[in-house]
UniProtKB/Swiss-Prot annotation:
Function: Involved in protein export. Acts as a chaperone by maintaining the newly synthesized protein in an open conformation. Functions as a peptidyl-prolyl cis-trans isomerase.
Principal subcellular localization: cytoplasm
Alphabetical list of InterPro entries matching this protein: PPIase_dom_sf, PPIase_FKBP_dom, Trig_fac, Trigger_fac_C, Trigger_fac_C_sf, Trigger_fac_ribosome-bd_bac, Trigger_fac_ribosome-bd_sf, Trigger_fact/SurA_dom_sf
Protein name: Trigger factor
Family, similarity comment: Belongs to the FKBP-type PPIase family. Tig subfamily.
Keyword Nuclease listed: no
Domain comment as written in the entry: Consists of 3 domains; the N-terminus binds the ribosome, the middle domain has PPIase activity, while the C-terminus has intrinsic chaperone activity on its own.
SUPFAM superfamilies: FKBP-like, Triger factor/SurA peptide-binding domain-like, Trigger factor ribosome-binding domain
UniProt KW keywords: Cell cycle, Cell division, Chaperone, Cytoplasm, Isomerase, Rotamase
A Pfam family it matches: Trigger_C
Species assigned in the record: Nostoc sp. (strain PCC 7120 / SAG 25.82 / UTEX 2576)
Residue stretches making up the PPIase FKBP-type domain: 169-264
GO CC field: cytoplasm
């Protein structure tokens, strides 16, 4: 079999394959023989159908098409093997199948073209001496006070209040019913449109402006128990329920009771109630340590993201469609698993209409992820960065001890750990051989959009899910 190769874009190898006359004839005859054994034709037993009858009943074009399918499949497989091509994914026929049927004659040579994806060639122009900027996340001691105050609020006792009007910080018990406010030009005599789910009885609302839609809380402030009034409010835009987004509303509100919060004292008893610590001092120290580490981890992550973003700029690679589609599949699978774990019906979210849109929107991120991964692999290859079995086993043992009750696939865990350790080593090497300048938090946000990897599509679908469920 004669095979001619050519290099194509998107990391493809083009193949021109010429099949010998002997093979085209032999395959055609074999197809006729096989069909005569399997086709049911009245008046004839299987395997005893005369050749001419078979050709008349099925048609020569049908038989040629069946033979051609075998010739193409076998021809491509043999060509890949003969040329020692490390193909990935499924081969693609470049010639027109219909044209091949018309030109195919058993006993004559058959020439057709196909293409296969191969692993891409990576040209890493630079990977040492990279320069980037990353935001430094500094620990703020005020976070400890904020967390403790939040815990106090959650443990607050509600005390009924008499003799005064509602004020910010109170908890109001109200009945309310909401309608869409009429716009200019609406029929004045028409019944106002009720807001779906916009009514409640004995509803407790904390009088903080961010607890409800804008205008609702401020409308209650100043009311006395027993008062009823109309409160104007405005649904934000965007809003979970897009049909209500940006619309003005009127709520008829009756204030039934006012309560104020009595907060527990910040002392050792409080610490024991909200944590496993015996003293408030120990609780504060633990929180401070946690948020200090969190700030350090975020800073390190920012450094890594900045460095990887810079590395990608120096990678020249023509990605094959097979790898891109595989990465998109992985991203959507991760998203589906995350949504399923949240209790959402993935089958209702991933409809036949939305999947193609999600795939298209996921492509840029898939390409970015692939470039990062291939870039790291190339650095490891050039610098001989590896992980030892001892390092892998140590991390596996650590993880197993952390999750003793989990049913863990040991082989899969080892693979994941090996990949993680290798990535960590490569990134540490890059950090040691590059310069990442730390700049104040927020100073880069407006300059360059942050590249978030797996979560982007998840967040997109989660918004759609919330709209669907009305949550």
């Amino acid at each position: 079999m004669k095979v001619t190769q050519e290099k194509l874009p998107a990391s493809q190898i083009g193949l021109e394959i010429e099949i010998t006359p002997e093979i085209t004839q032999k395959t055609y005859e074999q197809v006729i023989k096989n069909l005569s054994r399997t086709v049911n034709i009245p008046g004839f037993r299987k395997g005893k159908v005369p050749r001419q009858v078979l050709l008349q009943r099925l048609g020569k074009t049908h038989i040629k098409a069946a033979a051609l399918e075998e010739l193409l499949q076998d021809g491509i497989e043999q060509a890949i093997k003969q040329e020692s091509i490390a193909a990935i994914g499924q081969p693609r026929l470049r010639s027109s199948f219909d044209d091949l049927i018309n030109s195919y004659e058993p006993g004559q040579p058959l020439t057709f073209t196909a293409a296969v994806d191969v692993e891409p060639e990576i040209n890493l122009v630079q990977y040492t001496g990279l320069e980037a900027k990353a935001e430094e996340i500094k620990y703020d001691p005020a976070r400890v006070d904020e967390v403790l105050e939040k815990e106090r609020q959650e443990l607050a006792t509600l005390i009924p209040v008499e003799g005064r009007s509602a004020q910010i910080g109170d908890v109001a018990v109200v009945d309310f019913k909401g309608v869409i406010a009429k716009a200019e030009g609406d029929d004045e005599n028409a019944e106002p449109e009720p807001i779906p789910g916009g009514d409640a009885s004995d509803f407790q609302v904390e009088l903080q402006e961010d607890r409800f839609i804008p205008g609702f809380v401020t409308g209650i402030v100043g009311m006395n128990p027993g008062d009823t009034k109309e409160v104007s409010a405005q649904f934000p835009d965007p809003y979970v329920n897009q049909e209500l987004a940006g619309k003005p509303a009127i709520f008829t509100v009756t204030l039934k009771e006012i309560k104020e919060k009595e907060l527990p004292e910040l002392n050792d008893d409080f610490a024991q109630e909200v944590s496993d610590f015996d003293t408030l001092e120990a609780l504060r120290a633990s929180l401070a340590e946690r948020y200090q580490k969190e700030a350090e981890d975020k800073t390190k992550n920012n450094q890594q993201e900045a460095l990887l973003g810079e590395l990608v700029k120096h990678i020249e690679v023509d990605l094959p469609e097979t790898l891109i589609e595989k990465e998109v599949d992985a991203m959507l699978t991760q998203t589906a698993m995350r949504l399923s774990q949240q209790g959402l019906d993935v089958k209702k979210l991933f409809t036949q209409d939305i999947i193609p849109q999600l795939r298209e929107r996921s492509r840029p991120e898939a390409v970015e992820r692939l470039k990062r991964s291939l870039g790291l692999q190339e650095v490891a290859k050039r610098e001989s960065i590896t992980v030892t079995p001892e390092e892998i086993q140590a991390r596996v043992t650590e993880l197993v001890q952390q999750y003793p009750d989990e049913d863990i696939d040991a082989e899969r865990l080892q693979t994941i750990v090996e990949n993680e350790l290798l990535s960590e080593k490569i990134i540490d090497w890059l950090l040691a051989n590059s310069t990442v300048e730390l700049v104040p938090e927020g100073s880069l946000a407006s300059q360059e959009p942050e590249i978030t990897a797996p979560e982007t599509e998840a967040e997109t679908i989660e918004v759609a899910a919330e709209s669907t469920t009305g949550e």
